[in-house]
């Protein structure tokens, strides 16, 4: 560390106004010096553990468990601390207790014969484990993570060595008192939650919290309580964000997908969206239509025939409305270059055919009661009224708006963090592997500048309420991010929703991926992207989601010699037969990178009652001989800047450029 001297006085004088503001926080040489010492000490602590999860798709049970077990980190800590001194069944029970303390305690109280003895043994084990997981943090940081009820006691226990003779009696008496006053259960719950919190320093969610699963709102509610989180938006997130902003095409897509998978719990129970007007509309216009191609795809859902018929009619009704609303955007925004997706005007109702790319296809469904062949993209009066009601329902859902604001305040299209580049989908490329240029708002953009612009437009869609023109363009862009040909979130040439519903020919259903996916194994492509985002290619990784890794077919999630890692979480049950597993997560700790593959999760109930954990296997991707420290991280760089500023303040005090506060004034 080099302190400023007289040769640097001009720099100090240039920053004098800022330093005077800083002196309000550190009003003396003593306080500034103490802070420098504290910050320097933090730089030498081990780097905190980062946990990367992607593509949750609303599967809240699997996600909740993954969050609680930190992709096996807690289990590994138990192994490290207790080794062979505990039986495997005891380790498993201890892990389950930490994951689900309230529920597990209820079971133990019913089955344990000597509860006081069990409390004593368990408290010792939990305190020992908590001492280890808290050892890489400052006391101040640990203190902030402690529940107020037990903060003092936990801090005392964490910082005392129970095996020292002079402290053993003190240590034991605290534990015995906790049991004697009947607070053992509450203490176990508190310290288990502290372990869960401290075991992961930073959580990264790489997109697609929303989709077909039944509990996206439960997931976001849990994430909003997490101590340190960032989110890289996925295509399914962006369509919900667009819906919350009031984009009618996004609203139609969100409802259609929910009906397609018979998942109305998030819409109706989670967010209070009233779908009764849609049900009424569907029964009026599609009463005699069996809507065969719109029957919901269900997994583990018991629906009766009446429910299926109603959902099918609602599904078809909102799909036709969606195609009309999308057509309006395509016509309004020729720069999107999506004219080939205008299909309603290519329907010949009389012949029952579709003219697609100058080829005639037979439609498998020819009932279009709301389609005006002269103005196929116009909503009829009933449709317009319905769309207005649905839009009002989305805009006025307090919980939905709160959750979407959380996604905005904690999310981005991409993130650079500790030399890693995180994004959900892709960086749009040309066929030759070069960055694809896209024209938006009369600007030609590519790579980082494209993503930065799209990020800003996504925010304008939601926040520019007093600028209708900018808000409308932003909302249209939200829809484009969902399904546009150059969207970094979608990553395909087109979304063939219409063809899948109305054409039998499977060739028309194909969705061509962006060339990015062809080059994912190419180190040169990764190097190009690192340079574009101003990252060191030798020490960086791209961490990617979106496309499930087909492990059963031999696909490897480690691409480009370890430069690119695909961690599609595989939470979505529909993908698991294709992938063969329940996907991957990533851990980045002070020792290196660990990629963990997971088997499908049974249920939270089985995890609590039977101790069933997610079966996982871990691959060490990188291992460093010398542990990474805070010094080596982004937060370390920020701390170094703080030290630099405090050093300038010290010189300013010592040179008399700023006067120290009187000690008496500081105290009082």
Swiss-Prot record:
Reactions the enzyme catalyzes: beta-D-fructose 1,6-bisphosphate + H2O = beta-D-fructose 6-phosphate + phosphate
One GO term (biological process): gluconeogenesis
E.C. number: 3.1.3.11
Keywords: Carbohydrate metabolism, Hydrolase, Manganese
GO molecular function terms listed in the Swiss-Prot or TrEMBL record: fructose 1,6-bisphosphate 1-phosphatase activity
SUPFAM superfamilies registered for this protein in UniProt: Metallo-dependent phosphatases
Pathway(s) this gene product operates in, as recorded in its UniProt entry: Carbohydrate biosynthesis; gluconeogenesis
InterPro entries (alphabetical): FBPtase_class3, Metallo-depent_PP-like
Cofactor(s) the record lists: Mn(2+)
Any Pfam family matching the protein: FBPase_2
Signal peptide segment: none
Sequence similarity: Belongs to the FBPase class 3 family.
HAMAP family for the chain: FBPase_class3
Identification of the protein by name: Fructose-1,6-bisphosphatase class 3
UniProt organism field: Clostridium botulinum (strain Hall / ATCC 3502 / NCTC 13319 / Type A)
Gene that this sequence comes from: fbp
């Amino acid at each position: 560390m080099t302190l400023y001297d007289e040769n640097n006085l001009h720099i100090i004088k240039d920053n004098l106004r800022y330093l005077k503001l800083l002196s309000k926080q550190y009003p003396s040489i003593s306080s500034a010096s103490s802070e420098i010492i504290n910050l320097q000490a933090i730089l030498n602590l081990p780097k905190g553990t980062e946990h990367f999860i992607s593509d949750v798709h609303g599967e809240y049970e699997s996600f909740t468990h993954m969050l609680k077990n930190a992709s096996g980190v807690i289990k590994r800590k138990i192994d490290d601390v207790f080794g062979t001194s505990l039986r495997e069944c005891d380790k498993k029970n201890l892990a389950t207790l930490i994951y689900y303390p309230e529920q597990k305690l209820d079971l133990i109280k019913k089955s344990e014969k000597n509860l006081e003895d069990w409390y004593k043994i368990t408290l010792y084990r939990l305190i020992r484990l908590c001492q280890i997981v808290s050892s890489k943090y400052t006391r101040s940081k640990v203190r902030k993570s402690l529940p107020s009820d037990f903060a003092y006691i936990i801090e005392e226990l964490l910082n005392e060595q129970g095996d020292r003779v002079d402290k053993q009696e003190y240590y034991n008496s605290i534990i015995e008192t906790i049991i004697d006053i009947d607070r053992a259960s509450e203490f176990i719950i508190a310290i288990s939650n502290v372990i869960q919190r401290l075991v992961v320093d930073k959580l990264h969610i790489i997109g697609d919290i929303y989709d077909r699963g039944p509990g996206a709102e439960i997931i976001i509610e849990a994430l909003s309580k997490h101590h340190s989180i960032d989110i890289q938006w996925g295509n399914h997130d962006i369509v919900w964000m667009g819906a919350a902003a009031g984009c009618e095409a996004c609203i139609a897509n969100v409802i259609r997908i929910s009906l397609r998978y018979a998942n109305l719990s998030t819409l109706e129970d989670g967010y209070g969206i009233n779908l009764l007007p849609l049900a009424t509309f569907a029964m009026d216009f599609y009463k005699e239509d069996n809507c065969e191609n719109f029957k919901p795809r269900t997994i583990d859902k018991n629906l009766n025939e009446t429910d299926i018929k109603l959902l099918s009619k609602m599904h078809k009704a909102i799909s036709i409305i969606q195609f009309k609303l999308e057509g309006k955007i395509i016509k309004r925004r020729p720069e999107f270059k999506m004219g080939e997706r205008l299909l309603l005007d290519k329907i010949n109702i009389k012949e029952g055919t579709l003219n697609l790319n100058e080829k005639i296809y037979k439609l498998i469904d020819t009932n279009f009661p709301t389609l005006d062949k002269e103005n196929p993209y116009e909503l009829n009066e009933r449709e317009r009224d319905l769309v207005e009601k649905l839009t009002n329902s989305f805009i006025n859902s307090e919980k939905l708006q709160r959750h979407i604001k959380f996604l905005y305040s904690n999310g981005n299209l991409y993130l650079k963090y500790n030399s890693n580049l995180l994004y959900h989908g892709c960086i749009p490329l040309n066929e030759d592997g070069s960055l694809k240029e896209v024209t938006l708002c009369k600007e030609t953009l590519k790579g980082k500048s494209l993503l930065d612009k799209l990020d800003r437009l996504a925010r304008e869609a939601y926040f520019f309420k007093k600028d209708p023109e900018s808000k409308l363009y932003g909302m249209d862009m939200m829809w484009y991010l969902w399904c546009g040909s150059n969207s970094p979130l979608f990553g395909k040439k087109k979304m063939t929703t219409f063809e899948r519903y109305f054409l039998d020919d499977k060739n028309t259903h194909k969705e061509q991926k962006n060339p990015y996916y062809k080059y994912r194994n190419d180190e040169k492509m990764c190097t190009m992207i690192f340079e574009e985002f101003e990252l060191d290619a030798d020490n960086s990784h791209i961490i990617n989601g979106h496309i499930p890794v087909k492990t059963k077919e031999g696909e490897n999630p480690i691409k480009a010699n370890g430069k690119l890692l695909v961690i599609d979480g595989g939470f979505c049950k529909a993908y698991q037969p294709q992938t063969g597993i329940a996907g991957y997560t990533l851990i980045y700790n002070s020792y290196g990178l660990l990629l963990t593959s997971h088997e499908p999760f049974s249920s939270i109930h089985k995890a609590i009652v039977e101790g069933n954990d997610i079966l996982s296997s871990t691959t060490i991707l990188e291992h460093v001989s010398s542990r990474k420290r805070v010094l080596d991280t982004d937060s370390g760089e920020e701390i170094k800047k703080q030290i630099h500023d405090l050093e300038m303040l010290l010189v300013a005090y010592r040179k008399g450029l700023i006067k120290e506060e009187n000690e008496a004034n500081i105290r009082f």
